[in-house]
Each structure stands twice: as C-alpha cells, then as structure tokens.
C-alpha cells in the first residue's frame, strides 16, 4: 500500500516538473517571438519592457569577447554582414548594421545615457545608448562606463537614425547609431602617452595643458609613439596617397611593357666608400645605395624596359628636413631609339597621369590634409610641363637677385644649392602657376662620369632633375653605353677627383681608390658585350610625397623613418 502511495506522489512530482518545464519553454518561446526580425532589410521590432531581460539573453547583448565565447556571440548576431562607417548614408536609415570601430571618445551621464564617438578608416560617427531605449538596460550602460576605454575596439549592432542636431565632432554629422548590442573586441590601456584629439590638431595649433600653458606635440614625441600618431585621419591620408603613388607608378609601367625586377640590397662592392658596411659571413659587404647597376645589367640583358620599387640606403649625416638614411626609391630604366628626350617625355607623362588620378580619386584625403595643415595649397601642374636648362635657371636667378638686391647667386655655379632651388620654385610658381617642373643639361664638372655628354657641348650632360615646390624629388640621365667612352670618362673623372683631394693621399685612401677602381672595372665590363642606348630615373617616394603634399618634414612621409639618431620603432 505504501509503495502505491509513493508511486502516486512520485507521479505528481514528475507532473509538476514537466509542467514547470513546459511553462519555461513557453516563456522562452514568447520572448523569442517578441523579436520580430526582418532578415531581408535588417530591421527589428523589440517589444520587451526596460530591464525585463531574461538570463538567456542578457549576457548576449554586451560583454567582452574572448576565445571561449566568441563563437556563441557570432551565432547570436541577427545582423550577419559587416558594414564600414564610411558606407553609412541616408539610404541606410532605419536599418540595423554591424560595425567594428575604435572608440575615440566617451561621454557618459551616469547609468542612464552614454555617447560614444566611433571611428573607422577616414570616417567617424556618434553612437548613443540610453536606458529609456527599450533595447537597452542600466547594466549595459554600466558595462560601458566601467570597462570601455578610449581607443578600445568594439563590435556593435545598431540602428542608423537621423540626428536631431548636427554632430560637429564627427565626420558624419547628420546621422547617429542607436546601439542594440555591444561587445568589447580589444581593450586599450586607460593611460595613453598621447591623446588622439591632441594628435589630430594641426601642428601649428597651441594646445593647453591643465595649468593653462601652451604646448605643441613635438615630432619626436609623435615618432616615439608612432602607433598612436599613425591613427589620425591626417596620417592615414598621407599613407593612402603614398600607397596610391607607388601603385600608380607600378601600374603605368606594367601597362607600358616594363618588367619589374628585384635586385639584391646586400652587395659586395660599392662605389661610395661611405656606404653602410656589414659582416657577411666574415666578408665585408655593403647595403645598396642605388639599383642603377642592376637596372643597366637588365638592359644589357635585353630586358629593354625594367623598373623597381624598393629600399635604398645612404650614410648622410645631415639632420635636414629632406634626408633619410633609408628610403623607398621608384626607379626605371628603358632603351630609346634616337634621343634621351624619349625617356624624359615618358617620365613627364607618367608623372602627369599620377597627378591627375590623385586629384580625382583622392579628393577626400587631400581635403583632410588641407584642413590639418591650414596653409596647404592645392597642387598645380600643367599638361605641358615647364622645362629649363641649367643655364636658363641661373640666368633667371641672377635676374631675380638683381631685382631683389640679393647677391646670393651673382656668379654661375655648377649646381643649385637648397636656397636657390627654393627661390627658383617660387619664380616658376609666379611666372607659370605650376609646382611641377624639370631642369636639364647641368654642367659635367660635379656630375657622375657615367652620364652621356651633350653631343653639341661636352661640358653639358644629358641629365635632368625633377622638382616639386622647389624640392628636388628625383633625377635621371642618359647612360653611356659605349664601354670605351665610359672608360675614358672615368679616367678623366678619376684624375680630377684625385686632384681635388690631393691633401688626403694616405695609405687608407690609396686602398679605397684601388677598391673603387676594381668596382668601376666590373661595372664597365658588362658593356663590352654590346648595349642599347638607354636612360633611367630614380625618384624618392618619401621626397615626392613630402613635396606634393607640402609637408614640412620628410619624416612625416616615412612610415617609420630612419635618420642618424633614430632606429626605432
């Protein structure tokens, strides 16, 4: 009898448990049904009351992403496709989007309201979360206030809405995001050596510290914290343009049947005795200062048209605004039929095509740089580039000197110093209203021996320099392809060079001269197998970017610059 009663009580307990289970499943089903999601256009109607979150859902709307929960978080997203902030526009209003962005700023009003300024690429937008929003809770806002820091990276699902007032602190001013879910993807240290807002202010802008004193973030401080400095829209724009220039250079050459080569940067011999030396398996080697020898070797090998984009190394000790010890060189070499101007014309057209595409396709980046630099002037060029001979340049400088009562260039020198280059750039801008021009036919006295002399005047060379805003960004020349003439020119150069340095005739110099003679002999020998007429050019990428954008220092155009005092980062 007792066993029968126990059986009945057990059955009652099982029935109660089963009933509770059914009720719980029903409640869960009801909660799920309240989320009316339209998969087609990513819209959602959420009917829950505020703070009525069930344990099954609360932890899925906010939190930190880790290796254990990220699969579950991905699974529970109702927006499946990622968007960029730059993709958001009026046509997206009312739709839910999934975005990963960096937090630039946080403005919180207790646990009831919070504004996040988010940025991604070259765009930014405001996101808002309020406890009055039926999708949110105080707990979610508390998580943001207690956990999210500036420069952290977050993933959000949010609905795009029109903002009631323009948001001046963001790139997108007329739209904002109302957050539905938020997950911390990567947390930044709360103590930052430099703030994004300070880094984003113009270099001439005087920032105020807590004591009211003005200060400007020095370039060295920026370079010491390069990963923070590079995050600014200004720097991102610079390197997007730098990337575009190198890609356009490559694309245009490939279209014109050039072959890209990759020459060694560790070499056995160096013409310049001041090249960087290194121990190469107990043998002295050098870092390459130029790819010219290998480009000419390719021409001798009948490649006809070659180019290379790569690093070169110089041991310049000067701490100037335009010199680096490692930089990227845009180089090409090509044969021609009758005159080296065929190569110069090709280069000129190449540069003009790059300028045109930058002007058209990178208007936003140029505008950002313009706003940052304050004194930025739009780059100007002509489809008919002004070309000047060296003697014409000197005469124009003398005329300018006389008009300005300035005697800095009253004599005809065989080179242009930095002051003369800048002044001539201003003369060209005033007379021709362009920033880009070419100077050719320099005197042979201070130029390399391998450049072909002018057939009408051996004291002049078939050589040219490219200028932007008074800065020399590159140079090129017709090379001597006749080994006998090359040998003769070298002997004359060698004699003159020794006469100019006759006070340094010690044993070490004699050894260096012997090594240089061996290097030159190896260079001359490749032309004994026959070589086509050819010319080439080298352009410093960082120098080009600096001059084109009007940057005051070449280090701003280098991702991580190397100069005599900097080996990091």
Curated annotation (Swiss-Prot):
<feature type="region of interest" description="Aspartate">
    <location>
        <begin position="292"/>
        <end position="295"/>
    </location>
</feature>
<dbReference type="GO" id="GO:0004815">
    <property type="term" value="F:aspartate-tRNA ligase activity"/>
</dbReference>
<dbReference type="InterPro" id="IPR004523">
    <property type="entry name" value="Asp-tRNA_synthase_2"/>
</dbReference>
<dbReference type="GO" id="GO:0005524">
    <property type="term" value="F:ATP binding"/>
</dbReference>
<dbReference type="InterPro" id="IPR006195">
    <property type="entry name" value="aa-tRNA-synth_II"/>
</dbReference>
<feature type="binding site">
    <location>
        <begin position="314"/>
        <end position="316"/>
    </location>
    <ligand>
        <name>ATP</name>
    </ligand>
</feature>
<feature type="binding site">
    <location>
        <position position="314"/>
    </location>
    <ligand>
        <name>L-aspartate</name>
    </ligand>
</feature>
<feature type="binding site">
    <location>
        <position position="479"/>
    </location>
    <ligand>
        <name>L-aspartate</name>
    </ligand>
</feature>
<feature type="binding site">
    <location>
        <begin position="322"/>
        <end position="324"/>
    </location>
    <ligand>
        <name>ATP</name>
    </ligand>
</feature>
<protein>
    <recommendedName>
        <fullName>Aspartate--tRNA ligase, cytoplasmic 2</fullName>
        <ecNumber>6.1.1.12</ecNumber>
    </recommendedName>
</protein>
<feature type="binding site">
    <location>
        <begin position="540"/>
        <end position="543"/>
    </location>
    <ligand>
        <name>ATP</name>
    </ligand>
</feature>
<dbReference type="InterPro" id="IPR004364">
    <property type="entry name" value="Aa-tRNA-synt_II"/>
</dbReference>
<dbReference type="InterPro" id="IPR045864">
    <property type="entry name" value="aa-tRNA-synth_II/BPL/LPL"/>
</dbReference>
<keyword id="KW-0067">ATP-binding</keyword>
<keyword id="KW-0963">Cytoplasm</keyword>
<comment type="similarity">
    <text>Belongs to the class-II aminoacyl-tRNA synthetase family. Type 2 subfamily.</text>
</comment>
<dbReference type="GO" id="GO:0017101">
    <property type="term" value="C:aminoacyl-tRNA synthetase multienzyme complex"/>
</dbReference>
<keyword id="KW-0648">Protein biosynthesis</keyword>
<dbReference type="GO" id="GO:0006422">
    <property type="term" value="P:aspartyl-tRNA aminoacylation"/>
</dbReference>
<feature type="binding site">
    <location>
        <position position="475"/>
    </location>
    <ligand>
        <name>L-aspartate</name>
    </ligand>
</feature>
<feature type="region of interest" description="Disordered">
    <location>
        <begin position="1"/>
        <end position="23"/>
    </location>
</feature>
<keyword id="KW-0030">Aminoacyl-tRNA synthetase</keyword>
<dbReference type="Pfam" id="PF00152">
    <property type="entry name" value="tRNA-synt_2"/>
</dbReference>
<keyword id="KW-0547">Nucleotide-binding</keyword>
<dbReference type="GO" id="GO:0005829">
    <property type="term" value="C:cytosol"/>
</dbReference>
<dbReference type="GO" id="GO:0005737">
    <property type="term" value="C:cytoplasm"/>
</dbReference>
<dbReference type="InterPro" id="IPR002312">
    <property type="entry name" value="Asp/Asn-tRNA-synth_IIb"/>
</dbReference>
<keyword id="KW-0436">Ligase</keyword>
<dbReference type="InterPro" id="IPR012340">
    <property type="entry name" value="NA-bd_OB-fold"/>
</dbReference>
<dbReference type="GO" id="GO:0003723">
    <property type="term" value="F:RNA binding"/>
</dbReference>
């Amino acid at each position: 009898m007792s066993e029968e009663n126990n059986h009945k009580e057990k059955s009652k307990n099982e029935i109660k448990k089963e009933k509770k289970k059914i009720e719980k499943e029903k409640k869960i089903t009801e909660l799920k049904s309240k989320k009316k999601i339209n998969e087609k256009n990513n819209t959602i109607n959420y009917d829950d009351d505020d703070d009525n979150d069930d344990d099954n859902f609360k932890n899925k709307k906010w939190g930190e992403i880790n290796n254990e929960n990220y699969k579950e978080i991905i699974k529970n997203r109702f927006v499946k496709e990622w968007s960029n902030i730059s993709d958001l526009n009026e046509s997206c209003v009312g739709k839910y989007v999934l975005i990963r962005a960096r937090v630039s700023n946080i403005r919180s009003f207790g646990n009831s309201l919070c504004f996040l300024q988010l940025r991604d690429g070259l765009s930014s937008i405001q996101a808002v979360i309020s406890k009055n929003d039926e999708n949110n809770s105080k707990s979610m806002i508390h998580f943001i206030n207690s956990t999210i820091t500036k420069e952290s990276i977050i993933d959000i699902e949010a609905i795009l809405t029109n903002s009631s007032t323009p948001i001046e602190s963001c790139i997108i001013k007329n739209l904002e995001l109302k957050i539905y879910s938020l997950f911390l993807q990567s947390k930044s240290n709360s103590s930052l050596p430099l703030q994004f807002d300070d880094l984003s202010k113009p270099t001439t802008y005087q920032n105020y510290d807590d004591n009211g004193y003005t200060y400007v973030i020095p370039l060295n401080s920026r370079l010491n914290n390069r990963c923070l400095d590079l995050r600014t829209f200004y720097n991102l724009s610079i390197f997007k343009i730098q990337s575009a220039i190198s890609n356009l250079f490559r694309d245009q050459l490939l279209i014109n049947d050039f072959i890209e080569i990759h020459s060694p940067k560790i070499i056995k011999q160096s013409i310049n005795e001041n090249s960087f030396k290194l121990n190469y398996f107990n043998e002295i080697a050098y870092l390459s200062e130029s790819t010219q020898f290998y480009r000419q070797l390719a021409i001798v090998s009948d490649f006809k048209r070659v180019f290379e984009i790569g690093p070169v190394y110089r041991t310049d000790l000067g701490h100037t605004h335009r010199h680096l010890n490692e930089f990227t060189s845009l180089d090409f070499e090509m044969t021609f039929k009758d005159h080296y101007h065929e190569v110069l014309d090709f280069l000129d057209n190449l540069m003009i095509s790059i300028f045109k595409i930058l002007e058209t396709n990178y208007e936003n980046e140029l505008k950002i740089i313009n706003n940052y630099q304050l004194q930025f002037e739009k780059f100007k060029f002509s489809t008919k580039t002004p070309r000047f001979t060296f003697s014409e340049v000197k005469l124009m400088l003398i005329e300018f000197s006389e008009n300005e009562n300035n005697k800095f260039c009253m004599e005809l020198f065989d080179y242009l110093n930095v002051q003369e280059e800048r002044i001539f750039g201003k003369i060209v801008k005033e007379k021709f209203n362009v920033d880009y021009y070419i100077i050719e036919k320099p005197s042979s006295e201070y130029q390399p021996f391998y450049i072909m002399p002018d057939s009408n005047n051996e004291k002049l060379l078939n050589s040219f320099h490219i200028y932007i805003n008074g800065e020399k960004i590159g140079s090129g020349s017709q090379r001597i392809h006749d080994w006998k003439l090359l040998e003769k020119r070298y002997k004359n150069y060698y004699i003159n060079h020794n006469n100019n340095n006759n006070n340094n005739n010690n044993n070490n110099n004699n050894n260096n001269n012997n090594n240089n003679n061996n290097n030159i002999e190896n260079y001359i020998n490749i032309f004994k197998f026959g070589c086509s007429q050819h010319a080439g050019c080298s352009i410093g990428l960082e120098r080009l970017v600096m001059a084109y954008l009007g940057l005051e220092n070449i280090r701003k155009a280098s991702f991580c610059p190397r100069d005599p005092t900097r080996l990091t980062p």
